[in-house]
Swiss-Prot record:
GO BP: intracellular protein transmembrane transport; protein import; protein targeting; protein transport by the Sec complex
One Gene Ontology term, aspect cellular component: plasma membrane
Subunit annotation: Monomer and homodimer. Part of the essential Sec protein translocation apparatus which comprises SecA, SecYEG and auxiliary proteins SecDF-YajC and YidC.
Binding site residues for Zn(2+): 896, 898, 907-908
Cofactor(s) for this UniProt protein: Zn(2+)
GO molecular function: ATP binding; metal ion binding; protein-exporting ATPase activity
Membrane topology: Peripheral membrane protein
Highest classification ranks of the organism: Bacteria, Pseudomonadati, Pseudomonadota, Alphaproteobacteria, Sphingomonadales
Cofactor: binding comment: May bind 1 zinc ion per subunit.
Name listed for the protein in its UniProt record: Protein translocase subunit SecA
Pfam families, per the entry: P-loop_SecA, SEC-C, SecA_DEAD, SecA_PP_bind, SecA_SW
Residues reported to bind ATP: 87, 105-109, 499
Top-level enzyme category: translocase
Length: 911
């Protein structure tokens, strides 16, 4: 009570913070008349002026008011849109590296142009991150007009771009991209052998659109680049056949944690079935020999009992495609790891793709924390404010709406079962359609959306279905969901990022209806007619109550529910929202106080009857908070474990970068040899031991295996002053001499390339193996809890020990490879001489090598060059200042294609 009274008197901390920004907005507004007075050239010249001021020592905060005013005026001139004051407030929040929570329809896309322009002036680049390719393209094209007018470049990263296009987009002042593309490009860059092949540039400033979706909903899913392993498809199929024969008594499942385990009876049943199928070694399922079979049984059991088609995945074109549980979108290209995807493929009878081994991985949590400054925008972030601060150190600031929200949020309505609920929903929708009110229906799965569709068909209600099966038409369906009497069924995706305008989207209508009509007076008249029709329809829809958002059940997260509500009532429009629930809903069935609900429902409700209660709504909200807390703990645990790998990833990627950028790695190779020699001697001659206790035979064996040396160690042991330091010194000298001999067999540039290649390939191989080991460790370390140990602490200790062992193995393997490298020089096969033009004869003196032929017209030399086989270009091209490879994309550190043996940058690339 007292907190509420204090808030009403003094305002919340959010209100006070927003009010402090209003002073900056007043300064921005003061610049507006001056900006309006400038002609186009003058306004465009502001960019050069700002950059000069930054170069002179001013900060971005110093020029913010004038820069924001410049962008506002540029938007008016290019888009016909003027930033509201609340968008200016949001722009300041984003510039400060915070999260702007802004209601749907308030103009987040336009708001982002303010901090984008300001921060791009530094020349270090700005990334705007969106949830899908459509929004990335749309926003880059739409807002690119503002940036282009002010002299800044805009790029967009979407799938199927080649590396040149990606590099060009990343080098733009402002780059729009999806979170997946950014993450995978980062991982791919850190698998390349040449800096010139990389596409990313250093991180600077990122703005994440729909920040809650990317940094929270997708935080549990790591991005993984993987390579294929052995094909085990036959084993998956046979295990699937075994698991299909199990009954409910054979397993216990926990839907809250999405886990399933065999009972004692189930284990015995599985053992009998596996033995009959010839898949069991011995008689005990849990013998060490059956470890792999146990894993396959567990994954098949999970696939069959816990994963549902049209809810967790769909089968499209003979492939199992994952459905995002939060957005309802297909996640093409994503696969469940650890053999689960293959188990689902076996269940559905489609082709089983080989298992993959992780080559590189990162979570979005750790990827986005690499930005020195990161901000975000969304319509729903307040419920997750604590998580945003704990993990990303980002504050959530709620931006006031430009106009008051006029939407009415009605109490939830409860039914006994799903048939009663869907019947009531269908009748409600029919009534809304009859009065011309558009309805957006939110469902949690494809299965539920198609079930509701069948109910609507029985009621004779015309409607559109938007789910993962039809996502290609998502934007257009959602854009027209505000038309009079329109009924749109959507999974949770609900077209985030696409505004639902009352009366429909006039631009889409013009595009669809007039696509074949050429420009001219007739088209102008048709466009005017459509705009008038849309305006009239908008008023009719407002009179009917605005957009009605009807949800068929509550989601695990209140934030997802709020997102759905937020589709209605944009920019002060009227609207209505309501949730319809029943005991069959997953949230109530799995997390709700089921006994109490069931007793009350069965006692007080007749079939088809509904009940609405604030107490029930409060109970649902309590269940949601429990689920949110559990999911937060899971995400926090993901971060804790991934932080361990992230620290190691930084070290490895930093070392890769240093190797790639170094002109020579001789010092690194010498240090690795020295450490390897020291390790060999230390293992054979432990500190404090006597010579007769040393493992001399083991030392000889390792010296031969790793250093490729056969020194007289037995003779050395007979010397008077024998000690480990003597072995280290002599072996080191011999190993260095061997390496020098190898290097002398080729030219210096070639040897540098060989050393780099050995280092990078060895590093990558061991890092890949290390990732697999960490994955395996993570799967089993939780069992340490039974020994009263903290799994995360155990994981940290073991991961560190594994990392040290990996570094030691890298040093040893690099040293071994260099010691055993062998060169085979082959004479090139003679090339047939080209037929020369009749008018030209040449004579090369066999002793001097001089050309004694007569002078020829320089133009004819090009004819000769054209007749030569590919890549055999006359050497005099360099002298003449010509580079025949200029049009080709060749790395400067790659061998020159002319066959000289030198790097491109020292040969034709130097021209």
């Amino acid at each position: 009570m007292f907190a509420g009274l204090a808030k009403s008197l003094f305002g919340s901390s959010n209100d006070r913070y927003v009010n402090s920004i209003r002073k900056i907005v007043e300064r921005i507004n003061a610049f507006e008349p001056a900006m309006q007075a400038l002609d186009d050239a003058g306004l465009q010249g502001q960019t050069a002026t700002f950059r000069a001021r930054l170069a002179a020592g001013e900060t971005l905060d110093d020029i913010l008011p004038e820069a924001f005013a410049t962008v506002r005026e540029a938007a008016v001139r290019t888009l016909g849109m003027r930033h509201f004051d609340v968008q200016m407030i949001g722009g300041v929040v984003l510039h400060r590296g915070e999260i702007a929570e802004m209601a749907t329809g308030e103009g987040k896309t336009l708001m982002a142009t303010l901090p984008c322009y300001l921060n791009a002036l530094s020349g270090k680049g700005v990334h705007v991150v969106t949830v899908n390719d459509y929004l990335a393209r749309r926003d880059a094209e739409w807002m690119g007009a503002v940036y282009g007018f002010l002299g800044l470049t805009t790029g967009v990263i979407v799938p199927n771009l080649n590396e040149t296009q990606r590099r060009e987009a990343y080098n733009s002042d402002i780059t729009y991209a999806t979170n997946n593309e950014l993450g995978f490009d980062y991982l791919r860059d850190n698998m390349k052998f040449d800096r010139a092949q990389m596409v990313h540039r250093p991180f600077n400033f990122g703005i994440v659109d729909e920040v809650d979706s990317i940094l929270i909903d997708e935080a549990r899913t790591p991005l993984i680049i993987s390579g294929p392993t052995d094909d085990k498809s036959e084993l998956y199929i046979r295990v699937n056949e075994v698991v299909l024969q199990l009954t409910e008594e054979d397993y216990e499942k926990d839907e809250k944690s999405k886990s399933i385990n065999l009972t004692e009876e189930g284990t015995e049943h599985v053992e009998r079935l596996l033995e009959a199928a010839g898949l069991l070694q011995g008689s005990n399922l849990y013998d060490i020999e059956n470890t792999q079979v146990v894993h396959h049984v567990n994954q098949a059991l999970k696939a069959i009992q816990m994963f549902r088609i049209d809810t967790d995945y769909i089968v499209k074109d003979g492939k199992v495609v994952i459905i995002d549980e939060f957005t309802g979108r297909m996640m093409e290209g994503r696969r469940w790891s650890d053999g689960l995807h293959q188990a689902v493929e076996a269940k559905e009878g489609v082709q089983i793709e080989p298992e993959n081994q992780t080559l590189a991985s990162i979570t979005f949590q750790n990827y986005f924390r690499m930005y020195p400054k990161l901000s975000g925008m969304t319509g729903t972030a307040a419920t997750e404010a604590a998580e945003f601060f704990d993990i990303y150190k980002m504050n959530v600031v709620t931006i006031p709406t430009n106009r008051p929200i006029a939407r009415i949020d009605e109490e939830d309505e409860f039914y006994k079962n799903i048939n009663d609920k869907f019947g009531a929903i269908a009748r409600t929708i029919r009534e809304a359609q009859e009065r011309g009110q558009p309805v957006l229906v939110g469902t949690v799965s494809i299965e539920k959306s198609e079930l509701l569709s069948s109910f609507l068909e029985k009621e004779g209600v015309a409607h559109s279905v938007l789910n993962a099966r039809f996502h290609e038409s998502e934007a257009r369906i959602v854009a027209q969901a505000g038309r009079s009497g329109a009924v749109t069924i959507a999974t949770n995706m609900a077209g985030r990022g696409t505004d639902i305008k009352l009366g429909g989207n006039e631009e889409f209508r013009i595009e669809d209806e007039l696509k074949d009509m050429p420009a001219g007076p007739e088209r102008d008249a048709a466009e005017a007619r459509i705009r008038e029709e849309v305006a009239a329809e908008r008023e009719a829809v407002k009179a009917a109550g605005g957009l009605f958002v009807l949800a068929t059940e509550r989601h695990e997260s209140r934030r997802i529910d709020n997102q759905l509500r937020g589709r209605s009532g944009r920019q002060g429009d009227p609207g209505l929202s309501k949730f319809y629930l029943c005991l069959d809903d997953d949230l109530l069935r799995i997390f709700g106080p089921d006994t109490l609900f069931a007793k009350m429902m069965n006692k007080n409700l007749e079939d088809g009857e509904a009940i609405g209660s604030k107490w029930l709504s409060k109970a649902i909200e309590t269940a949601q908070k429990k689920v949110e807390a559990r999911n937060y703990d899971i995400r926090k645990q993901v971060v804790e474990y991934d932080n361990v790998m992230n620290d190691q990833r930084k070290v490895i990627y930093e070392q890769r970068g240093e190797i790639i950028d170094s002109e020579t790695v001789d010092d690194v190779m010498a240090a690795m040899r020295a450490e390897t020699v020291n390790a060999i001697v230390a293992d054979a001659c432990p500190p404090g031991s006597y010579p007769e206790q040393w493992n001399v035979e083991g030392m000889k064996e390792r010296v031969a295996n790793i250093l490729n040396l056969h020194p007289p160690i037995d003779e050395w042991m007979q010397e008077d002053a024998v000690d480990p330091e003597m072995f280290e010194e002599r072996l080191q000298r011999m190993a260095d001499a061997t390496a020098a001999e190898k290097a002398a067999l080729v030219d210096a540039e070639t040897w540098k390339g060989i050393e780099k290649s050995i280092l990078l390939q060895t590093l990558d191989h061991h890092w890949k193996e290390h990732l697999a080991t960490l994955d395996a460790l993570r799967q089993v370390v939780f069992l340490r809890a039974y020994a009263q140990k903290q799994p995360i602490n155990e994981y940290k200790q073991e991961a560190f020990a594994l990392f040290e062992r990996m570094l030691s193995n890298i040093r040893e393997d690099v040293t071994r490879t260099v010691a055993r490298i062998d060169f085979q020089f082959q004479e090139p096969e003679p090339m047939p001489l080209p037929e020369l033009p009749d008018f030209l004869t040449t004579h090369i003196d066999p002793f001097t090598g001089e050309d004694n032929s007569a002078d020829v017209d320089a133009g004819s030399l090009g004819v000769i060059a054209d007749t030569l086989p590919p890549m055999q270009v006359p050497k005099h091209d360099i002298a003449r200042g010509e580079n025949p490879y200029a049009a080709m994309e060749i790395s400067r550190n790659a061998p020159c294609p002319c066959g000289s043996g030198r790097k491109y940058k020292h040969c034709h690339g130097a021209i």
